[in-house]
From Swiss-Prot:
Recorded superkingdom: Eukaryota
Protein name from the UniProt record: Putative F-box protein At3g18340
Domain F-box: 1-46
Disulphide-bridged cysteine pairs: none
Amino acid sequence: MASGKLPWELEEEILCRLPPGSLVRLRSVCKHWNDLYNDKWFIKKSLGFARPQFIILAGFKIYSIGTIGLDVVDPKIEAEKWAFTRITACNGLLFRDFWNQGVTIWNPWLRQVGWIEYKEDKDFRFCGIGYDAGKPEKGYKIFGYFNRFYDTKLKIGHRFAIFECASQAFKFIDSPEWPTLAGRGEYVSLNGNLYWTAYNEDTREHFLGSFDFSTEISMHFCLLPCAKHVSGLQDKLVLTVFKGDRFALLKQSRISSNTEIWVTKDKINSSNNVVWLNLMTLSIPDFPSLFHQLSDISYFIHDMTLILCCDDNQTGVGCIFIARGDLCKKIQINYVSLGFSQCVYLPSLTSVPLEFRSLQV
């Protein structure tokens, strides 16, 4: 009996559900399968089936808590020169900030790396990355600031700026009022915009600050589901992307130590009419305190289970905590200790733009 051939639509449906690593190995099977790597619809659909993983920068190496092990971002860069670096994700790509020097842009699954250099003013503090969502091509832009002395008492202020990666030029952004800056590793990119948690000292309210790269405007995006506390007693808040188009907010009380997970009811768009829903509340003695962490904190939610990566309170070693209901399991990460940078990453088939691509690794 002659073997039948699957309809092309069914083949695509099967292929988009495979892990990116498997897809990379299959691209040489035929031209049609290889062409999928340039199909924006296929790339977007496969991203919807990707499983989150932690990407951890420890010492001079990068690791993933998942199915692959990752090496140094760019083997041509001397790692010992870069003591202060951070890693973040945006639109299926990884971005590693090399303090005062530039940023690498990277897709480990496609083995593509690019380098974005601050050629003019290297005293630039990286906050996060985004793009103009209204344009068909992603023109990546880096949001950050310069420290500036602006009186005879040498008080330090911030001069906000955008580094446009395509033109490799800085553009200063002047605004009469800026939300409070977030801490290290606390900026989240969604739909091209940048978001962070902030606190208003006057009203004692927690809110989301945002920066829209299409309008180049910063704003108070929405209030957060937090009680009002005086300064010094605020909850610990950690923002992340939920289901690809929403937000999740981890909230740990400084007073009770209870941990809550809140999620937005609807997809995030330009409207600031945001409704928050309580997804889960954890009251577990073994759950870590997230106050005074020396490393980044990241997490994702899968099947009503919280998977969290942070320092262990007793040893300072990096750990994965898996919490659900009244149960919590701790898994120690070997060779990862105090001060590591990390992020949650969805493996994707998004290519590094050709203008930045420096090498294949």
